[in-house]
């Protein structure tokens, strides 16, 4: 049996280390999700973000955001990666797209933050 080595992406490994050192439980939970194999990370479509959020919410996705569906209110989406169409639809609705790498500096208010895992 092969020993589990974790992510081979150096940037993801550094991000996991950085997130796990944070004091907020949300970032520790995101670090746990990122430690899973890449095929077990969540892939969230735009229509789910639209369904489960209110205007001006912050959504954290420890995986990839895909562009199926429409978004009819502004939402800030933080994720490991985005498809091109998902970025366009989020920005078209007045929302913001933030990578997990930059989210530690930009997300300060945790009142309207939702973690979405599919």
Curated annotation (Swiss-Prot):
What InterPro entries does this protein map onto?
Ribosomal_eL18/eL18-A/B/_CS, Ribosomal_eL18_arc, Ribosomal_uL15/eL18, Ribosomal_uL15/eL18_sf, Ribosomal_uL15_CS
One GO BP: translation
UniProt-recorded name of the protein: Large ribosomal subunit protein eL18
Q: The organism sits in which domain of life?
A: Archaea
Keywords, comma-separated and alphabetical? Ribonucleoprotein, Ribosomal protein
Recorded GO cellular component terms are:
ribonucleoprotein complex; ribosome
Is Mitochondrion one of the keywords UniProt gives this record?
no
Q: HAMAP family from the entry?
A: Ribosomal_eL18 (MF_00329)
Gene name, per UniProt, is rpl18e
Q: Which GO terms describe its molecular function?
A: structural constituent of ribosome
The cross-references to SUPFAM superfamilies, in alphabetical order and at most eight, read:
Ribosomal proteins L15p and L18e
Family classification: Belongs to the eukaryotic ribosomal protein eL18 family.
């Amino acid at each position: 049996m092969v020993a589990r080595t974790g992510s081979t992406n150096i940037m993801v490994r550094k991000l996991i280390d950085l997130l796990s050192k944070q004091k907020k439980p949300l970032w520790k939970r995101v670090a746990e999700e990122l430690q899973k194999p890449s095929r077990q990370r969540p892939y969230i479509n735009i229509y789910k973000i639209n369904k489960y959020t209110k205007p001006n919410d912050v959504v954290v996705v420890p995986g990839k955001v895909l562009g199926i569906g429409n978004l009819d209110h502004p939402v800030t989406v933080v994720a490991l990666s985005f498809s091109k169409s998902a970025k366009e639809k989020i920005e078209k609705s007045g929302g913001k797209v933030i990578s997990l790498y930059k989210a530690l500096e930009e997300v300060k208010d945790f009142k309207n933050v939702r973690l979405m895992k599919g």
